[in-house]
Amino acid sequence: MNKGQYFWNELWCEGRISFHKEEVNPDLIAYISSLNIPAKGRVLVPLCGKSVDMLWLVRQGYHVVGIELVEKAILQFVQEHQITVRENTTGQAKQYFTDNLNLWITDIFALNAALIEPVDAIYDRAALVALPKKLRPAYVDICLKWLKPGGSILLKTLQYNQEKVQGPPYSVSPEEIALSYQQCAKIELLKSQKRIREPNDHLFNLGISEVNDYVWRIRKG
């Protein structure tokens, strides 16, 4: 287990998962239709944790593919929502699945790419920003390989003074997004908003005075 894997396993084991939200993300609800996902289309949710957004996507009629490093996160998701799953292991990747939900337990960088069938869309609420800068280019490349031509990504990022806090979540500038996805046909900024200070906000509690949140729609050519 490398340093990054140990870090995330430790967070889940200790219950330090303030990044997990109990409510469906409002930006997902607001912008999912703009991706024009076909009926019963496949949606990839990388570094999915136990996100309730996955269940919401399934209820909209989509087939959801989640990839998560920490098995405890997936087991909690299945138990909390009383989902009856089947189990399969392929190489080093374990899979929990139903007819419309595939949850892979593995390091996304070690996963045999051929195991994931092409997807119509990718929903990234907190995956890119969970990765340090040196890993982000490889992550983008992997995801784009799984995305069908013409498919779209709904991506949420944030920007703040990285010198004060090392992350995660990491600050990702609009300039980095433009560079990282330059091979795509279209990059659209759907939303740019200064975050309102809330008592339980991790970054504000660490002394960050300003956080900007962004929502992007990126279409693969």
From Swiss-Prot:
Q: Which InterPro entries is this protein grouped with?
A: SAM-dependent_MTases_sf, Thiopur_S-MeTfrase_Se/Te_detox, Thiopurine_S-MeTrfase, TPMT
- Chief location category: cytoplasm
- Give residues annotated as binding S-adenosyl-L-methionine: 12, 47, 68, 125
Which Enzyme Commission number(s) are listed? 2.1.1.67
Task: State the protein's name.
Answer: Thiopurine S-methyltransferase
Q: Please give the organism.
A: Legionella pneumophila subsp. pneumophila (strain Philadelphia 1 / ATCC 33152 / DSM 7513)
Q: Report the Pfam families cross-referenced here.
A: TPMT (PF05724)
Gene3D superfamilies assigned: Vaccinia Virus protein VP39
Please name the GO terms of the biological process aspect recorded for this protein, alphabetically. Answer: methylation; response to metal ion
Alphabetized PANTHER family for the sequence: THIOPURINE S-METHYLTRANSFERASE
Q: What keywords would UniProt list here?
A: Cytoplasm, Methyltransferase, S-adenosyl-L-methionine, Transferase
The chemistry this enzyme catalyses reads: S-adenosyl-L-methionine + a thiopurine = S-adenosyl-L-homocysteine + a thiopurine S-methylether
Q: Where in the cell is it found?
A: Cytoplasm
What family does this chain come from, according to its entry?
A: Belongs to the class I-like SAM-binding methyltransferase superfamily. TPMT family.
A GO term for molecular function: thiopurine S-methyltransferase activity
Its Gene Ontology cellular component terms are: cytoplasm
